[in-house]
């Protein structure tokens, strides 16, 4: 939530959280939230690829840049959040995550949306979806 929507309103952050949950609750996507977030093509790190004797469990796989479901995961930038103690948006995002995960809150805010994009891009997949909401800088869609 923080990585995808920290510059959005609370409603915008909730909407992003609901997309993740809507996917986790739909058999077309993985059932675990983390698996939904990390879904996408990967490649093996050159460090482990050069060693043919490694076990599969010892190999390191990385997301292909700009090819995953949630852009922050594969943008190539560090994922560390600086100064979480004084970061209000971080605290809000964590509170929203708790409410959505623990209590399945705000279920109708994006009417079952399972896709979204920033309003400054126009991905081709949007043409095959039903537009359900516009919240802040994001446009939300439902794939039937």
Regions inferred by a protein language model and the residue ranges of each:
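Bacterial extracytoplasmic/cell-wall-associated proteins, especially those involved in peptidoglycan
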Residues: 1-144
């Amino acid at each position: 939530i923080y990585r995808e929507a920290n510059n959005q309103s609370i409603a915008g952050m909730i909407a992003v959280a609901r997309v993740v949950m809507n996917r986790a609750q739909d058999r077309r996507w993985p059932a675990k939230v983390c698996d939904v977030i990390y879904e996408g093509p990967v490649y093996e790190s050159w460090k482990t690829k050069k060693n043919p004797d490694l076990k599969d469990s010892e190999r390191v796989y990385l997301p292909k840049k700009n090819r995953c479901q949630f852009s922050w995961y594969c943008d190539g930038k560090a994922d560390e959040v600086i100064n979480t103690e004084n970061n209000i948006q971080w605290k809000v995002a964590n509170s929203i995550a708790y409410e959505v995960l623990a209590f399945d809150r705000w279920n109708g805010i994006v009417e079952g949306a399972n896709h979204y994009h920033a309003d400054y891009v126009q991905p081709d997949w949007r043409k095959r979806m039903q537009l359900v909401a516009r919240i802040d800088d994001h446009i939300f869609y439902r794939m039937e």
